[in-house]
Amino acid sequence: MGEFSIGQSVTRLEDPRLLTGKGRYLDDINYDRQLYAVILRSPHAHADIVSINTDAAKVAPGVHAVLTGQDYRDDGMGVVPCMGNYTRRDGSPMYIPDRPALAVGRVRNIGYPVVLVVADTESEARDASELIDVEYSPLPAVTSCYEAFKDGAPQLYDDCPNNESYFYEAGDKAATDAAFDKADHVVSQHLVINRVTANAMENRGVIGDFNPGDGRYTLRCGFQRPWLFRKSLADQAFKVPESKIRLVTDDIGGSYGLRGSIYPEMVLMPWVSKIVGRPVKWVADRSESHLSDDDGRDNIVDASLAFDADGTFQAIRIRSWGNLGAYVSYRGAAPPVVHIGTAIGVYTTPTAHVEISGMLTNTHCTSPYRGAGRPESSYMIERLVEMAADELAMDPAELRRKNIIPSSAMPYKTPLTYTYDCGEFEQNLDIAMEMADWAGFPERRKESEA
């Protein structure tokens, strides 16, 4: 094995500084004359904003600014950036609702920012936020992407029928239908892949600083891809040349995909810094993180596998609904689709057909999280393989071995979007079975039942 071979262990050099408390995270950093922000968030999943009274908050001790969505809109600000290049059923671009950094007229998920308060201290900002009176008129809400697709479900947007942001299809429907019609066996399962949250050690935080001398916004925050965010923020949120946006990131206390998105707070802090003429810092507490961080996964899947009497796989069929949330996050459209290329797993499957709906619901946005759709794919196919083995009364390991793609077949063109260029899948299976002592499992099960 060469010095830099694939799979070779790499000695970590970064740990001593972090383990001895010498890391430099956002909450370790403070600017001269820095102010603090607190965000009043929606307690409703879906509601019209009838009125907002901020009079008492504006005169509270230490307060410098109390701003609403109307202030944000009146100042000419844009939307929280998003990327998405899928299409709807008619071939038109996917539906991406405008996402203001502060709610305007209506809230569509619990935790959405409604009012921004800036004060000398965080405590003063929080006290002032409790003086704000927001009157809401609650509306029917839907949180399940499966239920949101049904006729009669609450609609988040008038111009988005059935709450379907996009529709994606891959594979050969005719060939797959024919294979299912001829198959000796079919197993099917309705899978609920639950929503999860990253819950990183370091809560999200932002420092915004506007320099009136050169008109440049500085955004200090934990990012995964600042070089990509810079242009998106300039074009979609601040409507300024890219050179007027400066992004700074320090040590990051965990991400797992969480920090690969652009959040409203990342727009609000530089914007309000320009208004008050001083740097502004916001750091979420743990409860606020659970209300405002992008979540992961949340898919409903109807999956079926067709196979012969001897266990030979013939086709797979998938109908999936992915929960995008009330808006489409920066990369949130991708995970429900990204996994499709690996939906057949490591098995020789002649044909497949997949249909996916990206759904809008009254929940917080989802984003790529730890594998960005691929673990969901593995879960789908492996559950079906287990069910097939059960129906045939066959050892699941041997059913896998029977259908596994041999290394001699590489490169292997799957019936979906990928071509596998290499892989020693049968060898991987052998190693896994040996390490898990698969042969000894029946005896261990008997012992556990005793």
Predicted regions and their residues:
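Flexible, low-hydrophobicity surface segments
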Residues: 1-161, 165, 275
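Glycine-rich loop/linker segments at domain edges
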Residues: 8, 14-17, 83-97, 163-206, ...
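Short coil/turn connectors at secondary-structure junctions
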Residues: 33-36, 60-64, 104, 111-114, ...
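Alpha-helical support elements that line or immediately flank enzyme active sites
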Residues: 39-73, 115-135, 206-276, 333-342, ...
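Beta-strand segments within the central parallel beta-sheet cores of soluble alpha/beta enzyme folds
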Residues: 69, 243-250, 277-287, 314-319, ...
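Short acidic, glycine/serine/threonine-rich loops at helix termini
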Residues: 77-81, 128-131, 199, 230-232, ...
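Glycine-rich and small/hydrophobic secondary-structure elements
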Residues: 83-124, 257-309, 366-391, 413-438
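Helix-loop-helix junctions that connect adjacent transmembrane helices in secondary transporters/permeases
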Residues: 153-237, 406-450
